[in-house]
A protein has these predicted regions:
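Short, low-complexity N-terminal intrinsically disordered segments enriched in polar/charged residues
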Residues: 16-67
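Short solvent-exposed beta->alpha transition segments
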Residues: 46, 56, 62-63, 67-109
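A short hydrophobic beta-strand element
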Residues: 107-120
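Zn2+-dependent metallopeptidase catalytic core
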Residues: 121-126, 137, 180-232, 263, ...
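Zinc-dependent metallopeptidase catalytic helix centered on the HExxH motif
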Residues: 239-312
């Protein structure tokens, strides 16, 4: 069963600042029945009879990419496709790919439909990990045509699969950009590395340390295309979950006119990676998912020193209901302000380590609000709600 869950992705312009919010898109891969004759078959899997030459070819090519063997990767590729495959090799190696695997899904000789699954450095690579689909024409053990698949995956097109990105390697962040944004790489990589220092602190709280973060810069055209074009005209950045394999971050730097805005958006989105990458968040926890990202993104400032104070309205509950579809700008602003102040209250009342332990137990371990509250704070969630609703009410205005 394929399950796609989305939340709002909007951008707010309040008090001269721009803040991106996450596009939380959780993708569960197709589960196949072992008795189903159309079942996906891993390339190189043990089968009865003589080895399949196409499976052997694809397995050898994937192995070459994983170990950084450019010659082995290009060996089965026709001359007309060598540049395309060389660019793809360089992109995936720049992203620190650690696992690559082909799965043949359909055969109509000489054409095969395949899925290329992949994982990057540090990721726990699950069987149902991220993947892209391709259509390959293979003649005499040579790939002569590579085309768009009949059924692309929900992630397609990924930022990297075109193979034309240029990369910068920061201390903590790998940043990829199309040639049109090459001139922004040095500036944004420096900002992202600085933001990552803050995000690393919260990843440690969450027990979700990241070997590296991945950040992609999009032009307006690519913004409407990457990851299926799920980003809206309102957003300037989003975190794209890759299931248990981690997450990517995409920003649209053309909509961010100041260094401060760039820093806040990147720090916010990497904050999502730090807190919820590798797990599936619940829609009802939107207040906490976005609230903690707001808290992280605004560091070292506290909520009352940000534009969110202007948008805060008197709360009725600590765990606010998720935004409704079609919410207007004022509703969006008030929701994110309340989430920010809610997390700020937890920090004010109990200290940052205990507040982040509550976040970890709720978002990563899926404890109930009451169980997470009792474990982290030593009191029930109703008491925490009363305390914070009162505190937040005094911050209004």
């Amino acid at each position: 069963m394929r399950d796609v869950t989305t939340t709002h992705d909007r951008v707010r312009h309040i008090g001269g600042f721009v803040l991106a919010v996450v596009v939380a898109i959780t993708v569960a891969s197709l589960v196949t029945d072992p008795d189903d004759p159309a079942q996906v078959i891993p390339a190189g899997a043990a089968v009865a009879g003589p080895p399949d030459p196409i499976e052997q070819l694809l397995t050898a090519q994937a192995t070459a990419l994983t170990r950084g063997d450019q010659t082995g990767w290009l060996k089965p590729v026709a001359p007309s496709l060598r540049k395309r495959y060389l660019d793809l090799f360089r992109s995936l190696r720049a992203l620190h790919v650690t696992t690559v695997d082909y799965r043949i899904t359909t055969r109509r000789q000489p054409t095969v439909q395949v899925e290329l699954s992949y994982c990057f450095v540090g990721a726990r690579c699950p069987k149902d990990g991220p993947k892209i689909a391709q259509k390959l024409t293979i003649k005499s053990n040579v790939i002569v045509v590579e085309a768009a698949a009949d059924r692309p995956t929900d992630l397609q097109p990924t930022p990297w699969e075109s193979g034309d990105l240029v990369f910068a390697q920061g201390k903590r962040v790998t940043v990829g950009a199309p040639p049109a944004l090459r001139s922004r790489l040095k500036e944004i990589t420096k900002i992202a590395d600085s933001a990552a220092v803050v995000d690393d602190r919260f990843a440690a709280y969450a027990g979700n340390r990241q070997p590296r973060y991945r950040l992609f810069l999009a032009t307006e055209k690519l913004w409407r295309s990457w990851y299926g074009g799920k980003a809206t005209n309102w957003a300037v950045g989003y975190m794209q979950p890759l299931g248990a394999a981690g997450a990517d971050v995409v920003i649209n730097p053309g909509r961010l006119t100041t260094t401060a805005a760039l820093r806040e958006v990147i720090q916010h989105e990497l904050g999502h990676v730090a807190t919820i990458a590798g797990v599936t968040s619940r829609h009802e926890d939107m207040w906490l998912v976005e609230g903690v990202a707001e808290y992280i993104g605004s560091q070292p400032r506290r909520a009352y020193d940000t534009y969110n104070r202007e948008a805060l309205t008197k709360p009725k509950a600590l765990a606010a209901r998720p935004l409704r579809d079609g919410a207007d700008d004022d509703e969006v602003a008030a929701f994110y302000a309340q989430g920010h102040f809610a997390v700020d209250c937890l920090v004010t009342a109990f200290g940052e380590p205990r507040a982040m332990e509550f976040v970890r137990q709720r978002l990563r371990l899926s404890l109930s609000l009451d169980d997470a509250s009792r474990s982290a704070f030593g009191t029930d969630f109703r008491h925490v709600t009363t305390t914070c609703v009162d505190w937040m009410s005094h911050q209004v205005g």
